[in-house]
């Protein structure tokens, strides 16, 4: 079902003792997307995620993905089962990554409002599970500046709703202009709300075709607003180092920003997960 270990910065997390992990300058969580192939193939169930995180990988914090329990957002019985399983294992539920709920920067005002309201149930679910945030997307359409205004509007309105429930709205570089660090940092600045921030992803900086935004520059731009971090990996060399990202350089950027929260392992390659 699973092969290999979980690596971060060329070091297998499974090789570290609990004492060594406690002395690390950051904490490690597991993003559920890392297991998307085994979940979608029905080899494991979403409800087993906490158990696998704890007993297979030795980690104690998780990041859920809404598409794996998409029809359960309002099912308190199901959410309670998730919560019980996590709590019984000492697992900390950090956030829910939310997709397929519309574009928060949709140029159509009605569609933008619908997208905002579609996320309300996930804010409620996050609060129930004890998460600090939901991760959303800032997709839009139009000119560069028009998309800034549209995404800012959608994010601000959703954040104002989530504020009353104590849940942060965090935006990942996850498609469209959000893969441009300058653009996304400008949007967050314009939202101008302490509960709206970023979730910098080490790998999602593809602009279009073979054009990529500099990932180190992008993460540097997004870290001042970060409330979570996604350590994206696709493949590793024989020494366990990521083949696309210099993790030593990237982790230094994260730590130099003053961030000391969780870094979520997110594997998106073809060999594991």
Walk through the language-model features, giving the residues of each.
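Active-site groove signature of glycoside hydrolases
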Residues: 123-146, 165-174, 178, 264-265
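N-terminal pre-domain/capping segments
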Residues: 1-128, 146-149, 156, 163, ...
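Acidic-and-aromatic substrate-binding clefts and catalytic sites of carbohydrate-active enzymes
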Residues: 37-42, 65-77, 103-107, 140-146, ...
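A cross-domain feature marking catalytic cores of carbohydrate-active enzymes
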Residues: 30-34, 64-66, 93-100, 136-138, ...
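Acidic/histidine-rich catalytic cores of soluble enzymes
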Residues: 61-62, 152, 156-252
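P-loop/Walker A phosphate-binding loop and immediately adjacent motor/lid segment at beta-alpha junctions
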Residues: 19, 246-263
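Structural motif
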Residues: 57, 224-226, 258
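Residues at the N-termini of beta-strands
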Residues: 60-61, 93, 133, 228, ...
